[in-house]
Amino acid sequence: MGDKTFFTLPKPLPGRLNVVFTLLQKPPRIKGVKWVSGDPKKVLKELRKMGYKSTILGGGAYLNTLFLKKKLVDEIVLTIEPKIFGKGLSLFNEDFDLDLKLLSAKKINHNSIILRYKVLH
């Protein structure tokens, strides 16, 4: 995730390594957080060397766009909630075309649905 997203959280997400992309020169030392910068492909390679087989990108528009343009995303999971925010938050910060294939649609409660898509590169 990006540092803007991370700093909206009350604390690091439990039970996992929180990898946070940042441009901060001296990010704070926080248990369970790995601060990174630079090429996402290199970061993913380093995580694989550490034994991680899969990752979840919980980024904002900038990171989502960066990872997709580098073809580093193989699935997109969207949660549909019964709430409309007007302009809302953008998922991406640039225009591009992306073809998806629906893998699953799961109703998680009486109002919410999780859609899982495969990214077709």
Where are these regions (language model features)?
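Enzymes that bind and transform nitrogen-containing heteroaromatic metabolites
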Residues: M1-H121
